[in-house]
Amino acid sequence: ILGLLKGISALLS
């Protein structure tokens, strides 16, 4: 689940 958060964070970045 942490990977998902990191992935979304990268997209928003």
From Swiss-Prot:
Subcellular location(s) of the protein? Secreted
Keyword set, alphabetical order: Amidation, Chemotaxis, Secreted
The highest taxon in the source lineage is Eukaryota
Q: Which residues carry this modification: Serine amide?
A: 13
Q: In which tissues is it expressed?
A: Expressed by the venom gland.
Gene Ontology cellular-component annotations: extracellular region
Name of this protein: Chemotactic peptide
